[in-house]
UniProtKB/Swiss-Prot annotation:
GO terms for molecular function: DNA binding; DNA-directed RNA polymerase activity; protein dimerization activity. Pfam families: RNA_pol_A_bac, RNA_pol_A_CTD, RNA_pol_L. GO terms for biological process: DNA-templated transcription. This is DNA-directed RNA polymerase subunit alpha. Residues 250-338 are annotated as: Alpha C-terminal domain (alpha-CTD). It catalyses: RNA(n) + a ribonucleoside 5'-triphosphate = RNA(n+1) + diphosphate. It comes from Ruegeria pomeroyi (strain ATCC 700808 / DSM 15171 / DSS-3). NCBIfam families: PRK05182.1-2, PRK05182.2-5, rpoA. Homodimer. The RNAP catalytic core consists of 2 alpha, 1 beta, 1 beta' and 1 omega subunit. When a sigma factor is associated with the core the holoenzyme is formed, which can initiate transcription. It is an enzyme of class 2 (transferase). Its EC number is 2.7.7.6.
Length: 338
């Protein structure tokens, strides 16, 4: 049965987010357990998406009074234009409106010009307001117009130059990605009695426009969306649902008691100790949940999976409205059918 290709793989059941020194920017995200090899597969894919594909905001061009090109200097400003541009690249923004938008800086010396001196605009927030842009000497004047836009990844300066760009407009390399650093590590982990699983640990740092755990969530959603085109079949209907002449809305096999299955003594005792009475109780358990049962190992798991497969069922199924209120009466009603 095709569903066994994915239904029999263990799925991560634990996702832990450990905030860093700055919770809005730094966090460690831990997911486990994963099938062996999936830690590397998912870690590498998520890292690439985090660094390249999330939407962010950045300054894409600047126009400075009395400056024609980036290799100029401004009277009374200690930094040359090239240094000012480098500093503008590091301004972190949160932008909740469609771009491009125009902002400005108007300062008089003596002064230290910071990102906090950038004019305010609805829907745009400067996050690192203490970031230094330049220093003005006494009597110096500085006026800049900044173009702010949204995008993803890295966009070079030549692509940020409009076709109708006025003289003096200097395009800037825009780094839109809100994620600054991503590192991941894969370690072995235990699930029940089995040691052969992966634990994925990701350390993430953002610019503050998005939290690390949200960044991972968005990256996972992007990956999910990109992979969906490769699924070239329709999911079979859940074996847990079945309308019949008696109005029963699930497979009557789910009313069969697990002690009627031909299981080993160890497996049967484990199910009994875990208060699993009916097959309907059993199939809603995931592999990870079963492996956490005391004295329940991979051998018992494979035995149960084989028995369920012969009935057209598998672990991890979803059965709505289970258990029914009159489960004992229903079980007796369908007892002869078993």
């Amino acid at each position: 049965m095709i569903h066994k290709n994915w239904a029999e793989l263990i799925k991560p059941t634990q996702l832990e987010v450990k905030p860093g020194n700055d919770p809005a920017r730094q966090a460690t995200v831990i997911a486990e357990p994963l099938e062996r090899g999936f830690g590397l597969t998912l870690g590498n894919a998520l890292r690439r998406i985090l660094m390249s594909s999330l939407q962010g905001a950045a300054i894409s061009s600047v126009q400075i009074d009395n400056v024609l090109h980036e290799f100029s200097s401004v009277a009374g400003v200690r930094e040359d234009v090239t240094d000012i541009i480098l500093n503008l690249k590091q301004v972190s923004l949160r932008m909740d409106v469609e771009g491009p938008k125009r902002l400005s800086v108007n300062a008089k010396g003596p002064a230290v010009v910071t990102a906090g001196d950038i004019s305010e605009s609805a829907g745009i927030e400067v996050l690192n307001r203490d970031h230094v842009i330049c220093h003005l000497d006494d009597g110096a004047d500085l006026f800049m117009e900044l173009t702010v836009n949204t995008g993803k990844g890295y966009v070079s300066a030549d692509k940020n130059r409009p076709e109708d760009a006025p003289i003096g407009l200097i395009p800037i390399d825009a780094i839109y990605s809100p994620v600054k650093k991503v590192a991941y590590d894969v370690q072995p982990t235990r699930e029940g009695q089995v040691l052969d699983y992966d634990k994925l640990t990701m350390k993430i740092e953002t610019d503050g426009s998005i939290t690390p755990d949200d960044a991972v969530a968005f990256a996972a959603r992007i990956l999910q969306d990109q992979l969906s085109i490769f699924v070239n079949f329709d999911e079979p209907e859940s074996a847990g649902r079945q309308d019949d002449d008696d109005g029963l809305e699930f497979n009557p096999l789910l009313l069969k008691k697990v002690d009627e299955l031909e299981l080993s003594v160890r497996s049967a005792n484990c199910l009994k100790n875990d208060n699993i009475v009916y097959i309907g109780d059993l199939i809603q358990k995931t592999e990870a949940e079963m492996l956490r049962t005391p004295n329940f190992g991979r051998k018992s798991l494979n035995e149960i999976k084989e028995v369920l497969s012969g009935m057209g069922l598998h672990l991890g199924m979803d059965v709505e409205d289970w258990p029914p209120d009159n489960i004992e009466d229903l079980a007796k009603k369908f007892e002869d059918a078993f």
